[in-house]
From Swiss-Prot:
It holds the Pfam family Seryl_tRNA_N. GO terms for biological process: selenocysteine biosynthetic process; seryl-tRNA aminoacylation. It comes from Marinobacter nauticus (strain ATCC 700491 / DSM 11845 / VT8). GO terms for cellular component: cytoplasm. This is Serine--tRNA ligase. The gene is serS. HAMAP family: Ser_tRNA_synth_type1 (MF_00176). Its EC number is 6.1.1.11. L-serine binds at T231, A232, E233, E285, S385. Consists of two distinct domains, a catalytic core and a N-terminal extension that is involved in tRNA binding.
Length: 424
């Protein structure tokens, strides 16, 4: 959530910057709500002041032997008017809160302009795509040949956009997740966390999925529904919700391996083949909680940690800086890592790394005590995939495939595969 004080004092500038994210800030509605809030607040304060004066007059009148009944009636009337004004003020404040809840984060100054993914900017490229002396297959064909991927059975069990993995491909999937966790905890200094896969609405509000993106979520039935997490970013970042951290606790780096669940409501007809876009998929998620002056550098570090996984797997990839129109709701700046998939002949997203600055922290009341001022201030939060496990498996399958349809196991994964060097 944006700082309301800043929105009030820099309204035109806020609207200009939000336009970079293709968001139209409704200045007229905001100013109308603000004008009502201020007017009602002044009226409430005046009524309170008048009530206090009348209450003091009662004591004086009583001591003087005067009839206090008229004063009591006045105080009661003022009390009723003040109560009505406070109710009206709460109603307007709720409208303002709902208005603010729907406003996305401001983009950083160096975010490139643009309307869609076509306007994203390639930042760097690592590795060279392999030249095959045969026509490379995609992961679907490879998985079917190896009898390790079964989409038909998954559809029978659940619905489309699910997968069943068996044998050495299931093991490869597990090995990738374990390798990622070990790299991040042992080499990059993250603390591993196990988190709930179901969370409440307040938790999803904190990270920005609710109220705007409810259609993308799976929820339980009943009066107090829970939601399946779309990413471990949600519970992991909220571990510091409603908390004032000591300076010594920062920076905090967390890593989680969880399944993720998304309805893909806006993805009809996109990536219907294979595992690229699933309702259920595994992801190793990285979360940073840092001091405000550290978040710019923290984004570079977090992105580098995700890149290291791809480098160790020797998978060609590129880093793109998302333009304003392609950025997520909570993000101030985002890098996407896109891995080369020979079966598709193009780069595909495998990680998205974002700095949300104090946007999520304000929504979830996550603060730290600034040692210079002694006062609580919002922390900055960052998140990124390190990596999406299923897409990493796809990349390994397609980049390490052989002419006979077998798949060589990357060197760094062999210890996790029990010595298996080739999946066939």
């Amino acid at each position: 959530m944006l700082d309301p004080k800043r929105v009030r004092t820099q309204t035109e500038e806020i609207a200009r910057r939000l336009a970079i994210k293709n968001f139209e800030f409704d200045i007229a509605t905001f100013e109308q709500l603000e004008e009502r809030r201020r007017a009602i607040q002044v009226r409430t304060e005046n009524l309170q002041s008048e009530q206090n004066k009348r209450s003091k007059s009662i004591g004086k009148a009583k001591a003087a032997g005067e009839d206090i009944k008229p004063l009591l009636e006045e105080v009661e009337s003022l009390k009723q008017q003040r109560g009505d004004a406070e109710d009206e003020l709460r109603s307007v404040q709720e409208s303002l809160n709902a208005f603010f809840a729907g406003i996305p984060n401001l983009p950083d100054d160096d975010v490139p302009p643009g309307a869609s993914e076509d306007d994203n900017v390639e930042t760097r490229v690592w590795g060279t795509p392999r030249e095959f002396d045969f026509e490379p297959k995609d992961h679907v064909a490879l998985g079917e040949q190896l009898k390790g991927l079964d989409f038909e059975k998954a559809t029978q069990l659940a619905h489309s956009r699910f997968a069943v993995m068996r044998g050495q491909l299931a093991r490869l999937h597990r090995a990738l997740a374990q390798f990622m966790l070990d790299q991040h905890t042992l080499q990059h200094g993250y603390t591993e966390a196990y988190v709930p896969y179901l969370v409440n609405a307040n938790t999803l509000f904190g990270t920005g999925q609710l109220p705007k993106f409810e259609e993308d979520l799976f929820r339980t039935a009943g009066d107090n529904p829970l939601y399946l997490i779309p990413t471990a970013e949600v519970p992991a970042t909220n571990l510091v919700a409603d908390t004032i951290l000591d300076d010594a606790e920062l920076p905090l780096r967390l890593v989680c391996h969880t399944p993720c669940f998304r309805s893909e409501a806006g993805s009809y007809g996109r990536d219907v083949r294979g595992m690229i876009r699933q309702h259920q998929f595994d992801k190793v998620e990285l979360v940073h909680i840092v001091r405000p002056d550290e978040s710019t550098q923290a984004l570079e570090e977090l992105t580098g940690h995700a890149e290291k996984i791809l480098q160790l797997l020797e998978l060609p990839y590129r880093v793109v800086t998302l333009c304003g129109g392609d950025m997520g709701f909570s993000a101030a700046k985002t890098y996407d890592l896109e891995v080369w998939l020979p079966g598709q002949g193009k780069y595909r997203e495998i990680s998205s790394c974002s700095n949300t600055r104090d946007f999520q922290a304000r929504r979830m009341q996550a603060r730290w005590r600034n040692p210079d001022t002694g006062k609580p201030e919002p922390v900055h939060t960052l998140n990124g995939s390190g990596l999406a496990v299923g897409r990493a498996m796809i990349a390994v399958m397609e980049n390490y495939q052989q002419a006979d349809g077998s798949i060589l196991v990357p060197e760094v994964l062999k210890p996790y595969m029990g010595g298996v060097e080739r999946i066939q």
